[in-house]
């Protein structure tokens, strides 16, 4: 501990001097320790650590979608920003811009915390009114929809508090009495590559054909980062809710950064997988749309019996034969099957296109305790 304290003292000395001395009496078995170190040697030993301090700066600019030239002031935060080499690296990174040293680096974090506290308390003080301090979601939040797709409701870096609501058709199978809501965080296209936060079931749903727009899901993050997910059966008003605190099941800073890096490196293949599953879901949805339309009273006299039989045969073939044996088909193959179905008996003219089956089972958006997730019944 004495050696660590002496090294810390030398580091601070080198921020204002070009050389520092370390003296420790009886460091080990009665042997005194004495040495000196220059600022140049110190900077050489710590060069990799100093360079790594620019990584969060670059990340903050990327996340905010800002260029270095758009930054007005560069404020130093934290005692280590007193190190001359760190200041030089930062100044060079911003093309020689002068650093703002008007705030004590040790007190800068406290200033920010005080402003955040005032904002959360609704302080009307003039000093706070002109300040904008935003917190953001570290990863995208969403749920699993048909085909294991990650359907995002709250995007990464969305400012919080925030609330998003989306309607889902494709969560239900034919006459299914309940639906499982699985909540994930992550940037990958498929939920298997993301982090499961929790799951809950919305049960006792009245029997209904597959695809009827029934389930409304709301993601709500408050100022403390607590996530509430509510699923509501729109036909009955019955709802179920799950609440996740910011420290239960959530990823660490290092894991978040790893997931962001992985998402960037797998972006192309993730998009291809998302498109493939979307095409598969669109085909399945169109089949059920056509089968349902064939039984509508208003269309019975418009479709010749021969054409009706062809369509019914195709509707039986696609989900029970072709899809069963082609689970890993490419996007183009699913689209080809859908075009064939549309062409038989001019389905697109007689029945009209399916308006809800092309988005992996989702429409466009409309608008805890220490033991873990809490599931709450809401009548």
From Swiss-Prot:
<dbReference type="GO" id="GO:0044183">
    <property type="term" value="F:protein folding chaperone"/>
</dbReference>
<dbReference type="GO" id="GO:0031072">
    <property type="term" value="F:heat shock protein binding"/>
</dbReference>
<dbReference type="GO" id="GO:0051085">
    <property type="term" value="P:chaperone cofactor-dependent protein refolding"/>
</dbReference>
<dbReference type="GO" id="GO:0005634">
    <property type="term" value="C:nucleus"/>
</dbReference>
<dbReference type="Pfam" id="PF00012">
    <property type="entry name" value="HSP70"/>
</dbReference>
<dbReference type="GO" id="GO:0016887">
    <property type="term" value="F:ATP hydrolysis activity"/>
</dbReference>
<dbReference type="GO" id="GO:0042026">
    <property type="term" value="P:protein refolding"/>
</dbReference>
<keyword id="KW-0067">ATP-binding</keyword>
<dbReference type="InterPro" id="IPR018181">
    <property type="entry name" value="Heat_shock_70_CS"/>
</dbReference>
<dbReference type="InterPro" id="IPR013126">
    <property type="entry name" value="Hsp_70_fam"/>
</dbReference>
<dbReference type="GO" id="GO:0140662">
    <property type="term" value="F:ATP-dependent protein folding chaperone"/>
</dbReference>
<comment type="similarity">
    <text>Belongs to the heat shock protein 70 family.</text>
</comment>
<dbReference type="GO" id="GO:0005886">
    <property type="term" value="C:plasma membrane"/>
</dbReference>
<dbReference type="GO" id="GO:0005829">
    <property type="term" value="C:cytosol"/>
</dbReference>
<protein>
    <recommendedName>
        <fullName>Heat shock 70 kDa protein</fullName>
    </recommendedName>
</protein>
<dbReference type="GO" id="GO:0005524">
    <property type="term" value="F:ATP binding"/>
</dbReference>
<dbReference type="GO" id="GO:0005737">
    <property type="term" value="C:cytoplasm"/>
</dbReference>
<dbReference type="InterPro" id="IPR043129">
    <property type="entry name" value="ATPase_NBD"/>
</dbReference>
<dbReference type="InterPro" id="IPR029048">
    <property type="entry name" value="HSP70_C_sf"/>
</dbReference>
<keyword id="KW-0547">Nucleotide-binding</keyword>
<dbReference type="InterPro" id="IPR029047">
    <property type="entry name" value="HSP70_peptide-bd_sf"/>
</dbReference>
<keyword id="KW-0346">Stress response</keyword>
């Amino acid at each position: 501990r004495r050696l660590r304290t002496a090294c810390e003292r030398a580091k601070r000395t080198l921020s204002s001097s070009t050389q520092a001395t370390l003296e420790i009496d009886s460091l080990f078995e009665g042997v005194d320790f004495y040495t000196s170190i220059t600022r140049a040697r110190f900077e050489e030993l710590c060069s990799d650590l100093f360079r790594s301090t620019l990584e969060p700066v670059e990340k903050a600019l990327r996340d905010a979608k800002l260029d270095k030239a758009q930054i007005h002031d560069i404020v130093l935060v934290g005692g280590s920003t007193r190190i001359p080499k760190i200041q030089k690296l930062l100044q060079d990174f911003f093309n020689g811009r002068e650093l703002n040293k008007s705030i004590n680096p040790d007190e800068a974090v406290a200033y920010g915390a005080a402003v955040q506290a005032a904002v959360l308390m609704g302080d009307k003080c003039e000093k706070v009114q002109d300040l904008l301090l935003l917190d953001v979601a570290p990863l995208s939040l969403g749920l699993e929809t048909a085909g294991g797709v990650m359907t995002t409701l709250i995007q990464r870096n969305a400012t919080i508090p925030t609330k998003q609501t989306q309607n889902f058709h494709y969560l239900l199978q034919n006459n299914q009495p309940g639906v499982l809501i699985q909540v994930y965080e992550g940037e990958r296209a498929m939920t298997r590559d993301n982090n499961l936060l929790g799951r809950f079931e919305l049960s006792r749903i009245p029997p209904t054909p597959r695809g009827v727009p029934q389930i409304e899901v709301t993601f709500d993050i408050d100022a403390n980062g607590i996530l509430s997910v509510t699923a509501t059966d729109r036909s009955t008003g019955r709802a179920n809710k799950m609440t996740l605190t910011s420290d239960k099941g959530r990823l660490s800073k290092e894991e978040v950064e790893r997931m962001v890096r992985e998402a960037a490196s797998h972006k192309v293949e993730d998009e291809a997988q998302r498109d493939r599953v979307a095409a598969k879901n669109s085909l399945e949805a169109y089949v059920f749309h056509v089968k349902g339309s064939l039984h509508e009273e208003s269309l019975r006299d418009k479709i010749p019996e021969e054409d009706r039989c062809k369509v019914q045969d195709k509707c039986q073939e696609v989900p029970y034969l072709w899809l069963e044996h082609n689970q890993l088909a490419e996007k183009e193959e699913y689209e080809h099957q859908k075009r064939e179905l549309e062409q038989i008996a001019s389905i697109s003219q007689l029945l009209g296109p399916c308006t809800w089956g092309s988005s992996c089972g989702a429409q466009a958006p409309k608008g805890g305790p220490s033991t873990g997730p809490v599931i709450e019944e809401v009548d």
